[in-house]
UniProtKB/Swiss-Prot annotation:
Protein name: Transcription factor AP-2 gamma
Residues carrying Phosphoserine: S252, S434
Cited Pfam families: TF_AP-2 (PF03299)
Cross-link Glycyl lysine isopeptide (Lys-Gly) (interchain with G-Cter in SUMO), sequence positions: K10
Subunit structure: Binds DNA as a dimer. Can form homodimers or heterodimers with other AP-2 family members. Interacts with WWOX. Interacts with UBE2I. Interacts with KCTD1; this interaction represses transcription activation. Interacts with CITED2 (via C-terminus); the interaction stimulates TFAP2B-transcriptional activity. Interacts with CITED4. Interacts with MTA1.
Free-text domain note: The PPxY motif mediates interaction with WWOX.
Length: 450
């Protein structure tokens, strides 16, 4: 169009020159001023008999794929198109490949905001700037029609954006992560549960969503391995089954065994990669044993015992205390100095009865301890604070401590019973009997009993 206007201007100048030559040299200044006015006017189009009015070429939109989500109203429809484009640039569609190939000149001109003058004479640039500005603005208005934009350009709402980016499943995935984490908080001995990054099956964006998860530990009653006893003779060696729950207790407070100590407890042979193989085996059942871990409790001889052997030792100790402890001789020996008179014997008897009551209360408390051992897991009956204290002691001794104390207190109760018997027999004797005669009487009663 601009070249046609330039040709028309040159044609008019040639006609004026010819007319001046044939009209006795009188210049036609009004005609030139009108031509200059048409030439330098920035916006109005030139009306010439030989030039038709400019019309933009027809636009054929490229084929595009219809999206599944619906459109929403443009939130900036009440503003002008120029202001709407400046406020919300996301609502403007990205040009496709076909549009870039079809209109390279228009994109370069609109992107820079200035007309392109490549190939034009340098002298015409000041004269044609106004005409080209008007033409560019007309073309911009023509191509900014709403029907030329993609159907989803004005409706890139939150739902569509979430579906395009693959974020529609993220709330459900984070809920699942939160539920798993809540379950982890309810488990006992959290420190040994396997922890690692969550491997989400529905993660289209490959986001590094990581939280501490509890892959539920395998069946706690499942046997992890069998361990030969340390205290048994070679002729009667017995093996004790170590369950998954027991391994979890040994890795948890208060002991917090490391790989070296746990390998010794489980009687694993020392090797170059023994710690790594043990950690891999524990990882398969859902337990975590970090490398370089430090033990929390002081190592004793009881540390080397598994729970089965420790409980076995406590039972044997209780049997020996019940069957072999000399309760009667000890009671007779300690009661002799207090048989001088009825008042002294009565005071001694009251002391023994009080001690017997204390031992009974103490034994009943220890018998209500519900610390899990082996495959047993009973419901607690004591208050939480006292049960936690008893569990700490029982876990340190692997079940041996409470049962051993009960056996020792039972031996003490047997002594008290025998002492009360001696006092009762001495109290029934005549008061004029001397302590020596009382001793002789006790000896005769002992011989008669045998």
């Amino acid at each position: 169009m601009l070249w046609k206007i330039t040709d028309n201007v040159k044609y008019e100048e040639d006609c004026e020159d010819r007319h001046d030559g044939s009209s006795n040299g009188n210049p036609r200044v009004p005609h030139l001023s009108s031509a200059g006015q048409h030439l330098y006017s920035p916006a109005p189009p030139l009306s010439h008999t030989g030039v038709a009015e400019y019309q933009p070429p027809p636009y054929f939109p490229p084929p595009y794929q219809q999206l599944a989500y619906s459109q929403s109203a443009d939130p900036y429809s009440h503003l002008g198109e120029a202001y709407a484009a400046a406020i919300n640039p996301l609502h403007q569609p990205a040009p496709t490949g076909s549009q870039q190939q079809a209109w390279p000149g228009r994109q370069s001109q609109e992107g820079a905001g200035l007309p392109s003058h490549h190939g034009r004479p340098a002298g015409l640039l000041p004269h044609l700037s106004g005409l080209e500005a008007g033409a560019v603005s007309a073309r911009r208005d023509a191509y900014r029609r709403s029907d030329l934009l993609l159907p989803h350009a004005h409706a890139l709402d939150a739902a569509g954006l979430a579906e395009n980016l693959g974020l529609h499943d993220m709330p459900h995935q984070m809920d699942e992560v939160q539920n798993v984490d809540d379950q982890h908080l309810l488990l006992h001995d959290q420190t040994v549960i396997r922890k690692g990054p969550i491997s989400m099956t529905k993660n289209p964006l490959n986001l590094p969503c990581q939280k501490e998860l509890v892959g539920a530990v395998m069946n706690p009653t499942e046997v992890f391995c069998s361990v030969p006893g340390r205290l048994s003779l070679l002729s009667s060696t017995s093996k004790y089954k170590v369950t998954v729950a027991e391994v979890q207790r040994r890795l948890s407070p208060p002991e917090c065994l490391n790989a070296s100590l746990l390998g010794g407890v489980l009687r694993r042979a020392k090797s170059k990669n023994g710690g790594r193989s043990l950690r891999e085996k524990l990882d398969k059942i859902g337990l975590n044993l970090p490398a370089g871990r430090r033990k929390a409790a002081h190592v004793t001889l009881l540390t080397s015992l598994v729970e089965g052997e420790a409980v076995h030792l406590a039972r044997d100790f209780a049997y020996v205390c019940e069957a072999e402890f000399p309760s009667k001789p000890v009671a007779e020996y300690l009661t002799r100095p207090h048989l001088g008179g009825r008042n002294e014997m009565a005071a001694r008897k009251n002391m023994l009865l009080a001690a017997q009551q204390l031992c009974k209360e103490f034994t009943e408390l220890l018998s209500q301890d519900r610390t899990p051992h082996g495959t047993s897991r009973l419901a607690p009956v004591l208050e939480t604070n006292i049960q936690n204290c008893l569990s700490h002691f029982s876990l340190i001794t692997h079940g041996f401590g409470s049962q051993a104390i009960c056996a020792a207190v039972s031996a003490l109760q047997n002594y008290i019973k025998e002492a009360l018997i001696v006092i009762d027999k001495s109290y029934m004797n005549p008061g004029d009997q001397s302590p020596a005669d009382s001793n002789k009487t006790l000896e005769k009663m002992e011989k008669h009993r045998k």
